[in-house]
Amino acid sequence: MKKFRGSAAVAGLSVLALTLAGCAATEELTPTSSPTAVTEEATLAPLITVGWNDIVDTFNTSSAAGNNVANSLTAYLTSSSFNYYDNSPALVKNTEFGTYEVVSEDPLTVSYTVNDGVVWSDGTAIDGADLALAWATIFGKFKDADGVYMFSHAAPKDNVASKLPTISGSTITFEYDVQYVDWELAFGIGVAAHGAVQMAYPDLSIADAKSKLIDSVMNEDTEWLAAVATVWNEGYSSVNTPENPLVYLSSGPYVLEELVEEQYSTHVLNPLYTWGPKPQYERVTIRQIEDSTAAIQAVDNGEIQIASGQPTADVLALVQALANAEYASSEEAAYEHIDLTVNNGGPFDPASYGGDAATALKVRQAFLLSVPRNEIIEKLIKPLNPDAKVRTSVLFIPGAEGYDEAESYYSDYLGTDDENRVKAKALLAEAGVSTPIDVEFWYPEGNVRRGQEYELLKLSADSVGFNLIDESEPNWAFTETVFPDLNPHDATIFAWAATSLSVSGDDQYLVLGGPSNWTGFDNAAAKGLLDELNVAVDPAEQLRIRLAIEAELAKDAYNITLFQFPGLTWWDNEVTGVSPNLLVPYFYWNFWNWAPTAG
């Protein structure tokens, strides 16, 4: 079972999952130059320990199994890529790792080259084999006889780049089938090709593993690739230090040194790393601390130096009372929402009413109306952010162009909580269903704020004709379901956390069969619009399409959004260089700048 996610599922492109659209327009993504590296002569501090509510358990974050924030943090310490986001947020090119360029505008053709001397932590060159594996997995090239992706990528894009690439040395060149709007965010190297192949075929040498992988991709030899795909999908999960070092090969500044289940992961400097900014600590330990109060105490005691967590009013007060620490509080590029499952035979599935879609729709609408969003904001979020407001759109953040129009599609839900409960009761009466209606509701066990949200929701929903059943558990098992498997819960609450400012990508959870579609949502019009969005370069056209998608979500009572995620980071004042980021990986984004305070 996947031990997953104290707070949020990752959202993004390239090696991660879906995109949280609407954070910024494409033209804001202006690449800047690589950061200045710390001098080789700098004296390294021995260790910095940071807290997080979970630690790594899967080392392939490109896979559906590995797509969560905790895994992405270790990946960020131990990986390199062609670009990343700073905290502006602006896209920064890492030209010390490699380069990329548009070779042709029509058809859109791009080329990526890894620089000479860039190697995996075992000394093996990063080259065309790694690029070939990345291409095959990201673009969903290979499927089995049932049409299922052989490589279970978290966000496969099989409708944008289907033609085989050209590979030469450490360069890959490939053509897009369409003018893909997010091409600059779509490609990045994941796990080592020779590692995946050697785990599947242990008798192969590194050279043979690489050449066989390239040949099999180029010749579409799915029979040989099947074993590699199994490893890629399942072979990178481990809750303790993996016995096989191929599992955690690094291309970044750090490499895993030790992993202890539900306790900590320690990462030591990669002595071969020379292609990017240099960290100032020899080791980074990520310590699992699920309770924010305990993390505050740990900073106060000097046990850890940096922490972040889901704040409550009490947590913020404790952080503000710390005598030896600084803190930063701001909204993050993540949002809380409640999703409804429409294909599991539960109360929101038309099948429960003899296939009567209209009845199921009214029940969904009634439930969404019963969510006391205003009370949740007033009691749980405004103590952290006095300016906090209900977020009413799936695709647009508050204040963004298009948000007000998107909000208008949900006009029936914009009343007071009391007014909405009256509407909910009326809808259930119109539907002619027997009440109370059982709703099996999941939230992550141990998450204080989510528990508080559930209690407020249960009081409200039960008062209008529902019966919320607590199905909280810590393991997020429902995220392992991929259609046609069914989510056993009728409703779930969690947050999507964005890693990029991409325009496209919402098809991962809005298209049936998408790796993060755990609701069974299936809307042909929305699917067609999502395909259009992939190639919409004009910002005005992007806006039109996204508003049309939002209208479909509102019409179908897809889900209900609650609030923009409040973020809180605190750190010992003996550490400098801490700078929170609204995107994942949050405050880790510039770990190379963390340093002991001078003097």
Name the predicted role of every residue range.
Residues 50, 123, 300, 304-306, ...:
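Periplasmic binding protein-like
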